[in-house]
Amino acid sequence: IARKESNTKVLSNIDAVNQARSMVEAVHLIQLGARASMVCQLTGLNKNIVSGLYQPLTGMPSPSGQVPFTDTWYLKNNRRLLHANVVWRLFQQLERMERTVANVLVHVYKAYVEIVDTPLLNLTRASFVPRLVRIKAWYEQACDHCGMTYIGPLEKSGSICPACTEYFNYRCRSCGAAIEYRPTGRRKMLCTDCYERQKRSKRRLAHGGIDG
């Protein structure tokens, strides 16, 4: 009887530790912007407990909105795809350690926010990246230019990673020189020197080959 009571006490202590760990993970997820449904799914806590944490932690109820179910948002902008690849690399590193799913996501997102200047993915978008690989919407493939592996939809003709795409987006189409980044407006295709050279060439043609 004493041994049975001892085992029951040990199991009770383990349950208490697991509950405390889940609560800590829930707090971290909420502070990073997770919705109540995600917190419940990742920690196993019931909805009433999770919902009760939002007001004291954030001063407001759980954010509304739906979990993404396609990759459309990521593919609308190359930089989003680039950031998704950063998140994927972090997941690969941290999933090798003996951590809970919630703990991995918390550490991945904190590392991602530290690495990039301006995070483009919120916690929900970041958590969906490994799922895109699991459901075979995205695949690992090698870039034809740099040879590095990246994730994304399978390309039918050639393969170029988001980093190389970003690189070539800001290189002169004529000479390959770097072009300064423009956050707004149309992207420049030529560097200043090539642009001026092209203008002079057009003027010569307009005047019958005579500069002036």
Functional labels for PLM-detected ranges:
Residues I1-H28, L32, S37-G212:
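Long, charge-rich, low-complexity intrinsically disordered regions
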